[in-house]
Regions:
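Bacterial N-terminal signal peptides that target proteins for export
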Residues: 2-12
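Intrinsically disordered, low-complexity regions enriched in Ser/Pro/Gly/Gln/His and often acidic
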Residues: 5-6, 49, 185, 291
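C-terminal motif of bacterial Sec signal peptides marking the signal peptidase cleavage site
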Residues: 21-23
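Bacterial signal peptide processing site
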Residues: 25-27
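Acidic, serine/threonine-rich low-complexity disordered tracts
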Residues: 30-162, 202-314
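Surface-exposed beta-loop interaction hotspot
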Residues: 158-204
Length: 314
C-alpha cells in the first residue's frame, strides 16, 4: 500500500513539474511575441548622427512655448501651447517608459503637447503624447490624448502592436466607451516627432493618414485613415510641411527650421468649425513660437523654479 502511495506522489509531482515548465515556456513565448509585435513591421534602423546624440541625449528636455489663437465654437480664443520633446527608453511589451535598462527597450523621442485656452466662462486643457522611435524605422509605438473642460473629460489611446489598438472614453453619447483595432497607416500625431528626427523622410504625395486624436475627438469624427495630400516646401531658412484632407475640409501646416535640430516655429490648422457639416464655416487656429528652453524640467519642481515659466512667457 505504501508503495502505491509513494508512486502516486511521484506521479503527481512529475505532472505538476511538467505543467509548470510548459506554463513558463508558454509565458516566455507569449512575452516574446508581445515584444516583437510592434517591431514586426519595422524597417532598418536609421543611424543617429553625432549632433543628434549630443542634442537629444544631454540629460534634459526641449521646451518651446507658443502663443495660441484657437478656433472653437465659431470664435477665436487666445491661449498658450507648449511642446515638450525628450528622449527616453520605452518598454516594448508594456508600452510605457522604462524605469530600468533592458536589452529590449526601444529609444524614443517623446512629444508632450499641451494647449490651454478659455471658451467663455470655462477653460479647456488639452494634452497629446506621442512616442516615436528615434531610429525612424516604424510607426509611433503609442499615442494618447486627453481633454478636460467643465462639461467633462475625454481620453483616447492608441497602441502599436500587430495592429493599432485603440481605446477611447468620452462623456459624449456619440463617442462613449470604445475599444477596437485598425490597420496601420501614417499617424498625423507621429509626424511632429518625425520632423524632429528625420524631416527629409516625411511622407509626401497622395497618401492615407489618420488625423490627430485632438481633431478627431473635438470634431466628433470617425477615427480612421483619410485620403490626404502632403507637401514639403522650403523658403529661406524654413520648411513647411502641409497636409490637406479634402473629405474633412481641413489643412494643417507645420513650419520648422531647415537646419538641425529642426525646431518647430509655428503651425496653422484651417478647418470647417461646424460640427454637423450643415454649413461651411472655415476658421484657422494658429500657434507662433515664443521661447525655447532646454532643461531637466522634472528636477525643477520647487517654488524657486517658478521664474522658469516667466522665461517661457507662460
Amino acid at each position: 500500500m505504501k508503495k502505491y502511495i509513494k508512486f502516486d506522489y511521484l506521479t503527481l509531482w512529475t505532472v505538476l513539474f511538467s505543467i509548470l515548465v510548459n506554463s513558463c515556456s508558454e509565458e516566455k513565448k507569449s512575452n516574446t511575441a508581445l515584444l516583437t509585435e510592434a517591431s514586426s513591421t519595422a524597417n532598418p534602423k536609421k543611424e543617429l548622427s553625432d549632433e543628434f546624440k549630443k542634442y537629444w541625449y544631454a540629460g534634459d528636455a526641449e521646451i518651446t512655448s507658443y502663443r495660441l489663437e484657437q478656433a472653437r465654437y465659431g470664435e477665436m480664443r487666445e491661449g498658450t501651447s507648449v511642446l515638450i520633446f525628450v528622449t527616453e527608453p520605452f518598454l516594448a511589451k508594456k508600452q510605457v517608459k522604462a524605469d530600468e535598462h533592458h536589452a529590449d527597450n526601444i529609444p524614443v523621442l517623446k512629444l508632450n503637447s499641451t494647449k490651454k485656452y478659455l471658451t467663455g466662462i470655462y477653460p479647456y486643457s488639452i494634452m497629446s503624447s506621442s512616442f516615436y522611435p528615434v531610429h525612424d524605422n516604424q510607426h509611433a509605438l503609442k499615442v494618447s490624448f486627453s481633454a478636460q473642460e467643465w462639461c467633462g473629460q475625454v481620453y483616447a489611446q492608441l497602441n502599436n502592436r500587430n495592429k493599432f489598438e485603440i481605446i477611447s472614453h468620452s462623456y459624449f453619447a456619440s463617442d462613449a466607451d470604445q475599444e477596437f483595432e485598425m490597420d496601420k497607416e501614417i499617424l498625423e500625431d507621429e509626424l511632429w516627432n518625425k520632423i524632429r528626427v528625420n524631416p527629409n523622410n516625411l511622407p509626401v504625395g497622395t497618401i492615407q493618414i489618420i488625423p490627430s486624436m485632438e481633431y478627431i475627438r473635438l470634431s466628433h469624427k470617425e477615427l480612421k485613415a483619410y485620403k490626404a495630400t502632403a507637401t514639403l516646401t522650403k523658403e529661406n531658412e524654413f520648411k513647411t510641411y502641409q497636409i490637406s484632407y479634402p473629405e474633412l475640409d481641413r489643412t494643417l501646416k507645420i513650419k520648422f527650421s531647415n537646419a538641425f535640430p529642426y525646431i518647430i516655429d509655428s503651425w496653422s490648422e484651417t478647418f470647417n468649425s461646424d460640427f454637423d457639416n450643415k454649413a461651411k464655416t472655415m476658421m484657422s487656429s494658429k500657434a507662433t513660437k515664443m521661447k525655447t528652453l532646454k532643461t531637466p524640467y522634472w528636477q525643477k519642481n520647487g517654488n524657486n523654479h517658478l521664474s522658469l515659466r516667466d522665461s517661457l512667457g507662460l
